[in-house]
Swiss-Prot record:
Positions of the catalytic residues: 13 (tele-phosphohistidine intermediate), 91 (proton donor/acceptor)
EC code: 5.4.2.11
Source organism superkingdom: Bacteria
GO biological process: gluconeogenesis; glycolytic process
Family per record: Belongs to the phosphoglycerate mutase family. BPG-dependent PGAM subfamily.
Protein name as annotated: 2,3-bisphosphoglycerate-dependent phosphoglycerate mutase
SMART domains referenced in this protein's UniProt entry, alphabetically: PGAM
UniProt-listed InterPro entries: His_Pase_superF_clade-1, His_PPase_superfam, PG/BPGM_mutase_AS, Phosphogly_mut1
Top class in the EC scheme: isomerase
Pathway: Carbohydrate degradation; glycolysis; pyruvate from D-glyceraldehyde 3-phosphate: step 3/5
Length: 250
């Protein structure tokens, strides 16, 4: 039996309400904007145009990623395939920064501290109190967790997501399946860091645009054929990544 390579399709959710208002979102369950809905649909259309149709979808427990998956699948006429939702694909928890405006936070704490919280590998923001407005401490969807995070750095996301990827998702890709992961900027940065062996320092420079599929081809042995992945709309991806990099400006 000849084994074929599988495709791992990474799709960051479309623009959310707090992307549009330049706020730290983390685990706060905000919805997509109309622009974000259109981005998600376009992501699905790109899958069809490039003949990269998913067999299964993995997403987080946050509606912006779930709805992005649903809209993309509908546009690709793959609404019928299995969808697996797991908290380990959630966005990074931004701690006490959740809900704060990025530009105002940058002005208050300075560029160096702002970038350390936002882009360093091992520096988490201050913890969010359990009784704070944007805490998830009492959220029923996390009732089976031993404890809900109060803050996270990217290293924490790597430690919760990559073992799940290795155990649950990668084996399907190695069997030749096309697997769509509809998730978040930082959960996808954690995965790309792992796939491309990006250093702890260099990962600060990686930005994932919204709504544009990034495809990795993976052999049955688990080798990435195209390091760095292939965006299905490279021009839009470059512009989108630049916009993400500039968040925090006026």
């Amino acid at each position: 039996m000849v084994m074929t390579n599988g495709k791992l399709i990474l799709l960051r959710h479309g623009q959310s309400a707090w992307n549009a208002s330049n706020q730290f979102t983390g685990w706060v369950d905000v919805d997509l904007t109309t622009i974000g809905e259109a981005e998600a649909k376009r992501g699905g259309e790109l899958l069809v145009e490039n003949n990269v149709l998913p067999d299964v979808v993995y997403t987080s427990l946050l509606r912006r990623a779930i709805r992005t998956a649903n809209l993309a699948l509908d546009a690709a006429d793959r609404h019928w395939i299995p969808v697996v939702r797991d908290w380990r694909l959630n966005e990074r928890h931004y701690g006490a920064l959740q809900g704060l405006n990025k530009a105002e936070t940058k002005d208050k704490y300075g560029d160096e501290q702002y970038m350390a919280w936002r882009r360093s590998y091992g520096t988490p923001p201050p913890e969010l109190a359990d009784d704070a407005e944007y805490s998830q401490a009492g959220d029923v969807r996390y009732k089976d967790l031993e404890s809900v995070p109060r803050t996270e750095c990217l290293k924490d996301v790597v430690e919760r997501f990559i073992p799940y990827f290795e155990e649950e998702i990668l084996p399907r890709v190695k069997k030749g399946e096309n697997v769509l992961i509809a998730a978040h900027g930082n959960s996808l940065r954690a995965l790309v860091k792992h796939l491309d062996n990006i250093s702890d320092d260099d990962i600060a420079e990686l930005n994932i645009p919204t709504g544009i599929p990034l495809v990795y081809e993976i052999t049955p042995e688990g080798t990435v054929v195209n390091p760095g992945g292939t965006y299905l709309d490279p021009e839009a991806a470059a512009a989108g990544a630049a916009a993400v990099a500039n968040q925090g400006g006026k």
